[in-house]
Amino acid sequence: EYLAMLEAFTTGDPDGNGVNGDTYGVSAAGFIGTEAPYTNYLPEFYQDANPSFYKAEDGTWKDGFTEDSMKSALERMAAAYKEGVIDPTTLTNGTSDCRNKFYDDSFGVFTYWAGTWATNLKTNLEANGKDGELVALPPIAEVGQYLDRVPPVWCITSACENPEGVFKYFIEPMQDGGDVQFLWTYGVEGIHWSTAEETLFAGTENEKTYADGEFHMLENREKEGTQYTKAHIDPMLALVELANDPQEESVAAEAKESAQLFNDNCKAADLVPTTDEMSEYNGDLTTLKNELIAKVVMGEITVDDAYAQFESNHGAEWSQAIVDSLNK
């Protein structure tokens, strides 16, 4: 069913320009992500495969790239690429390239952040004169659950001359549940948000009128025709409850719905520890894996050729050294 949908986006005329077949089913910022869990841009093709290290059910660490599930994933991606449902510029795309193509209706399926980004995508489509209705897809049966990546964190570096001050005046008050957290979440009154009676985007199809005292985000100064969704802290991801949080009024329905769908259908990705062997070999190993994945998907080599090159170019050796170090 998923492939049939991609084929419809590819062979039909979803952008309504009167030309069949000048669009693609799915696009991504690479055939493999640049950060763990690596598979999130094309999960329907990876399915149960993991191109990197993971902890198995028996508690041991393994390199998923060496397993048959990864070979099957490569075959699925190569077949879809050959059929034309995967955007041929996927290898060189950045996330901004994908977003811009999505806003132009150049392809149909885009795996991206749940929550706030559902609103960002919708409003940018509408700003481009496109239909802003988006459908958040639950995972297909072969995927089972989406992977929730290990979250980014605020850090105080070892080079910091006053770490206590950074914690006291930044990190701690940013999560005070009060005025400072509100500032980091919603920004500055009159710049990012307001409670004044006013109409935004007057005379356009996105016109919105707010009553006096009604909290609302203001027009984004960097993206005309859209509203801010947050300042720094995503209100749906805050660690500390914010007193007098206007979230119900500020967070759009599509953001809440997509976040809930993801939360109901995800599992946490493994946090892979570092080892000396990981530091020594994983950079070159990852580069080799990425090169082989791209060559297979684009039809330059077969899956069997890729794994022969993985062996001859020390990939299997580096992989085993890292696995052994993780299982000590």
Cite the ranges covered by each PLM segment:
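Extracytoplasmic/periplasmic substrate-binding proteins
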Residues: 30-86, 115-148
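Conserved small-residue motifs centered on glycine
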Residues: 168-294, 300
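Histidine-centered catalytic/metal-binding microenvironments
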Residues: 293-328
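P-loop NTPase catalytic cores that bind/hydrolyze ATP
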Residues: 25-31, 104-114, 285
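Glycine-rich, aromatic-lined ligand/substrate-binding cores of catalytic
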Residues: 73, 79-82, 98-116, 120-124, ...
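Helix-loop-helix "hinge/cap" segment bordering the ligand-binding cleft or interdomain interface
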Residues: 1-36, 53-97, 101, 156-168, ...
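Short acidic (Asp/Glu) and glycine-rich catalytic loops that position anionic groups and cofactors
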Residues: 52-57, 147-150, 264-268, 288-290
